[in-house]
Amino acid sequence: MPRPGQPRPSSGPPRLGPWERPTELCLETNDERSQPPPGRRTRRPDPKDPGHHGPESITFISGSAEPANEPPTCCLLWRPWGWDWCRAAFCFRRCRDCLQRCGACVRSCSPCLSAGDPIEGSSEAAWAKEHNGVPPSPDRAPPSRRDGQKLKTSMGSSFSYPDVKLKGIPVYPYRHATSPVPDADSCCKEPLADPPPTRHSLPSTFTSSPRGSEEYYSFHESDLDLPEMGSGSMSSREIDVLIFKKLTELFSVHQIDELAKCTSDTVFLEKTSKISDLISSITQDYHLDEQDAEGRLVRGIIRISTRKSRSRPQTSEGRSARSTAPAAAPDSGHETMVGSGLSQDELTVQISQETTADAIARKLRPYGAPGYPASQDSSFQGTDTDSSGAPLLQVYC
C-alpha cells in the first residue's frame, strides 16, 4: 500500500528524470552477439624489417571497405573504437603478407591494398634513412644493394664504378665468364673495340706479325727471333742478314762507323749515292716500302758499328785489288797502314822499315825518341844545315 501523498506506481517501467536517463539504451535484438571491446593489441615487427625496433600498435585504415547503411545510434558496434576494430579485422587478412615483408601496414593499409608487392625503391629509401641517428646496417640492405656490393667486391677495391666509359668504351668490361652478367640498362655490356694495327711499314700483302713489337729492334743477332712476315716470303731475320752482307760489301767498317754518326740527320741520305741505290734495291728485292727499307738499313748500320768484336768478311774484290797492287817503295808507314785496311776488328798489324827520313823527323821533335839527351835539344846536331845561333825573330822596340 502506498502511503498517502505518494504517487501511485504504474504497471510499466518506472520513469526516470532527465538526469537519471542512461546514455545508451537499445531495445533491438541482433543475431550477432555484441563482443566486448578488445584491448589494445600490439605486434612485434618482423626481424627482417630494418625500420622498426620496437612493438607498434596496429591501426588500420580501410581502403576497400564498403560503406554500410546508417546503423541505429544505440548499437555499441558502431562506436568509433568499434569501427576501428572492424576495419582492422577486414584489413588484417590482406595486409598480413605486407606486414611480414615491408612493415608499411602498421601505419597505413593503403600501400598493400593498391599493390600486392612492395616497391623496390621504397625499400631502398627506407633502408637509406638513419634510425635514431644510427647509420643503416649493410647486413639488412635490400637485395639490389647487396648485389651491387657483391659486384664491387668482385671488381676489387681500387675500382668501384663499373659504368665508367672512356671515349665510349667501358673502362671495366666483362671479359671473364665468372663475372656477373650486367643488366639491360648497364653500359658495361659493350665489348672493347679492337685497337687498330700499329704496324705501317709492311704492305697489305703480308700478314701482320703476332708479336707486334718489331719496331723495337734488338741490336743483338741472338734476339732476331722474329716470325715470318708471310707464307712463302723471307723472314725478317733473313732480310736483315742480307742487308748486313750488302753493307759490308759496299762500305768498310770505318765508313759504316761514320755513317752511324749521321743516321739521325738528313745528311745520311745525302752522304753518297750508294745509300740511295741500296735503299731502292732493298725496296724492289724484298717488296718493302721505302720507309721500312731505310729503317732496316739504319738498324743494320748501327748494329755493325756497335759490334766491334765481329770480323769483317773479306770480299773477292778486296782480295783481287790487294793482290794486283804494285809493290810500293818503303815509306814512313802511313800509306802502308792505310793500304792494308787496318781496322779495330783485325788483330794483325804491319809495320814498315825505318828510313833515314824517319830518323831525321824523330830527331827534329824535342823529346821525340826515348832516351834522347836533353843537351841536344837546342843544338840540333846531326842535321844537314848549320845554325848561327841568331834568333829567328827580332823584336823592335
From Swiss-Prot:
Coiled coil: none
Organism superkingdom: Eukaryota
Listed transmembrane segments: none
Pro residues: bias regions: 1-16
Biased composition annotated in UniProt, kind: Low complexity: 321-330
Ranges where the record places region Disordered: 1-67, 124-158, 191-214, 304-339, 361-392
Stated role: Plays a role in the regulation of the epidermis formation during early development. Required both as an inhibitor of basal cell proliferation and a promoter of differentiation of basal progenitor cell progeny.
Basic and acidic residues composition bias: residue spans: 44-55
GO cellular component entries: anchoring junction; cell cortex; cell junction; cell leading edge; cytoplasm
GO BP: any one term: regulation of epidermal cell division
Protein name: Keratinocyte differentiation factor 1
Residues carrying Phosphoserine: S218
Bias (Polar residues): 201-211, 375-388
Stored Pfam families: DUF4656
Subcellular location, record wording: Cytoplasm; Cell junction
UniProt keyword Phosphoprotein, yes or no: yes
Record's keyword terms, sorted: Cell junction, Cytoplasm, Developmental protein, Differentiation, Phosphoprotein
